[in-house]
Amino acid sequence: MAPATAVVTPQTAFKTDLPVEKTAHNTVVKSEMGALSKAYPTYSLDESFSFAPIRESTVSRAMTRRYFSDLDKYAESDIVIVGAGSAGLTAAYYIGTRRPDLKIAIIEASVAPGGGAWLGGQLFSAMVVRKPADLFLNEIGVPYEDEGDYVVVKHAALFTSTVMARTLALPNVKLFNATAVEDLIVKEGKDGKQRIAGVVTNWTLVSLNHGLQSCMDPNTINAHLVVSATGHDGPFGAFCVKRLASAQLVSNLHDMRPLDMNRAEDLIVKGTREVFPGMIVGGMELSEFDGANRMGPTFGGMMFSGIKAAQEALAIFDERKAVNEKYL
């Protein structure tokens, strides 16, 4: 008989199996120490129920005012992250928590962020994460089963929804989803050197249908650094490295190699770096750039590549900002 699997619940994870005590107006959950930890409201949904009144234009203004305020605020960002998959979201969380003074804009082409991290692989639910990437699960509060050299999150969506919630709750992070990066801003400074200075954006539906309509010009976001984690080759995948290559700013891409889990995850993490001044590449996009192996349905490499990208960004940000302000 196989030994029982240890289930690890980080201290920041939510408890759902605690004893309850009902009062007249609330259901109160007791903590393991017996103290009252959370009071749930009573939902009175009888025939007298009604929502607070609202006018349709109020809803429209509530959305548009905030969105256009965000567009104005993040038109000059400190760091832009392209791609809100497991690597991109992890990078945004790491930078946002370690440097709350920085403005971080995330650009995601899909309506739904998360990339390929909503399922473990081939429509299966569980997510396998090789150690020591369980450290990040502990930090954000995702419970898992400890299997020795690896851990298993019961559903990949539990990780993705958690890292997304933790990241988007940060006051210095803004996600622009359903928004595609169509090009890069590349500037030659007074020192004669070229640098990435931001991204060119458009609504994804526009980007997908340029051939079916009259021209619609894009928008722009300036940034001192761009972190690209757009995944492997696809309609929007590996976009930034493909654009660097087509603009002859880097040599030709080497294309992703066949699957080798042990080799792939180590190489992705170790190889995450600034590939062109102002452009850091991580995640599966890096495998298209370097010609590294794919790793398949194991996600520790994506998480730690995101952290490595964030560490690289934080290590050079102040220098890049100073150089840009001096020469651009």
From Swiss-Prot:
Binding site for substrate: A87, E108, A109, G116, V181, D217, H232, M284, R294, M295, G296
Secretion signal, residue range per the UniProt entry: none
A molecular-function term among this protein's GO annotations: iron ion binding
Pfam families: Thi4
GO biological process: thiamine biosynthetic process; thiazole biosynthetic process
GO cellular component: cytosol; nucleus
Modified residues (2,3-didehydroalanine (Cys)): C215
Keyword Signal in annotation: no
Keyword Iron: yes
Enzyme Commission identifier(s): 2.4.2.60
Subcellular location: Cytoplasm; Nucleus
Protein origin, superkingdom: Eukaryota
UniProt keyword terms in alphabetical order: Cytoplasm, Iron, Metal-binding, NAD, Nucleus, Thiamine biosynthesis, Transferase
Cofactor: Fe cation
Post-translational modification remark: During the catalytic reaction, a sulfide is transferred from Cys-215 to a reaction intermediate, generating a dehydroalanine residue.
Group of enzyme by EC: transferase
Function summary: Involved in biosynthesis of the thiamine precursor thiazole. Catalyzes the conversion of NAD and glycine to adenosine diphosphate 5-(2-hydroxyethyl)-4-methylthiazole-2-carboxylic acid (ADT), an adenylated thiazole intermediate. The reaction includes an iron-dependent sulfide transfer from a conserved cysteine residue of the protein to a thiazole intermediate. The enzyme can only undergo a single turnover, which suggests it is a suicide enzyme. May have additional roles in adaptation to various stress conditions and in DNA damage tolerance.
Subunit note: Homooctamer.
Protein name: Thiamine thiazole synthase
Lineage of origin: Eukaryota, Fungi, Dikarya, Ascomycota, Taphrinomycotina
